[in-house]
Amino acid sequence: MRTLLVVSSCVAVLTAGMLGLHALPGLAAANAPDLAGGGPWFNTDGRPVTIASLRGKVVGVEMWTAGCENCLNVLPYMKQWYAKYHGQGFVLVGVHTPEFAHEGKVEYVRAAIARLGIAYPVVMDNDYRIWNAYHNAYWPALYLVDKHGQIRYTHVGEGEYDVTERQIAALLSEKI
C-alpha cells in the first residue's frame, strides 16, 4: 500500500509538471526580481535588460536551456507570442540556465539562438542567480510580469498555450 502511495504521488508530481503549474510558492503577485547577475546578453547589442527599464510593458521571463526537449517544444509558442504581441508592448526575455556544463558555453548558446531563430533578448544565467531570484525549479517556466512589475502568472512545462496567450492579452489590455 505504501509503495502504491509513493508511486501515485510521483505520477501526480510529474503530471503537474507536464500540464503546467500556475502558481509557484512565494512569487504570485510579487514584485518581479530583476534580471541582474546574468550575462552575456544576446539580441540586445550586449546591453543588459532590467525589469525596471521595462515598466509599462508586459514582460515574459522564460527559463529555458537549449538542451531541454520540453523547452524546445514550447519555443514555437514563445516565438509566436513575441512576434504577435511585441508591437503591443510585450517583451520576452529568455533566461538560459544550463542543466549540463556544455550548455553554459557562450558559443553553444549563441549557436542555439541562431539555429532556433530566437529574435528576443536572451541572457545566460550560468550561476543560477536569476533562476534562484525567481525561486525557479523547472525547465521550461514562464513568468508573466505586468506593467507595474508584478508577477501575475506563471506556467511550468508544456501545454495550456491558449490559457497563457489569454493571460498575455489580458495583461496588455490593462491600464497603467
Where are these regions (language model features)?
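Hydrophobic alpha-helical membrane-insertion segments, chiefly the h-region
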Residues: 10-22
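Thiol/disulfide oxidoreductase modules built on the thioredoxin-like
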Residues: 57, 112-120, 124-169
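Positively charged n-region of N-terminal signal peptides that target proteins for export
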Residues: 1-4
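N-terminal "domain-start" segment that seeds a small globular fold
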Residues: 20-51
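Signature tryptophan residues that serve as conserved aromatic anchors
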Residues: 41, 64-67, 71, 131, ...
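Short active-site neighborhood of thiol/selenol oxidoreductases, capturing the structured segment around
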Residues: 49-72, 78, 92-93
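Structural microenvironment flanking redox-active thiols in thiol-disulfide oxidoreductases
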Residues: 72-116, 126-132
